[in-house]
């Protein structure tokens, strides 16, 4: 796709809106999604809407930054410093970013069955997904895996959080939960487990066996992504939970 062409000059089946309607939003490049929000182009060299979307990403990505990470926290004034982005375009972008955040912040009602990592992530997103500091939280469940509540145990720094098995199980027992899922976030968005994450999970699984409170999973969340340690490790084979 040529970024200096007007959208009207692009073949119909290659235009962002038409491609989204035909194939769904996942096939669109980020610049094309932004183009739909912008509606029109301009900026340096009279760019098309797609070209302006690409230019915006390049500007946000200066100094080797992740442009989408910057976009999540950008202000209207910062957006409007980019040539071609005025108040109307800036507010459209920011409204879309905020709407995306809110969809991840939906929390299931209490007593909702938590039967998959996706369901657990939905319950934890408000507390963990978009936070700038690492947080450690627990999902409190009853014997039928129904949600009793969530609880943030600790809040750390941008790169680490401190949570001990003692603190975690104390809160689980205090709240009267009979099963649990633990989770923490990585503000970087990289949801691969660290060696420390693996070791803490090992300790928690051993403690859960001793206390008779099955630990169903340990999730890592960050910037719209998640990882289930139960799915990517063999720890639950080493420490069966009787679930």
Swiss-Prot record:
GO terms for molecular function: DNA binding; metal ion binding; metallopeptidase activity. InterPro entries: Hlx-hairpin-Hlx_DNA-bd_motif, MPN, RadC_JAB, UPF0758, UPF0758_CS, UPF0758_N. It comes from the Bacteria. Coiled coil: none annotated. NCBIfam families: PRK00024.1 (NF000642), radc (TIGR00608). Belongs to the UPF0758 family. This is UPF0758 protein Ava_0172. It comes from Trichormus variabilis (strain ATCC 29413 / PCC 7937).
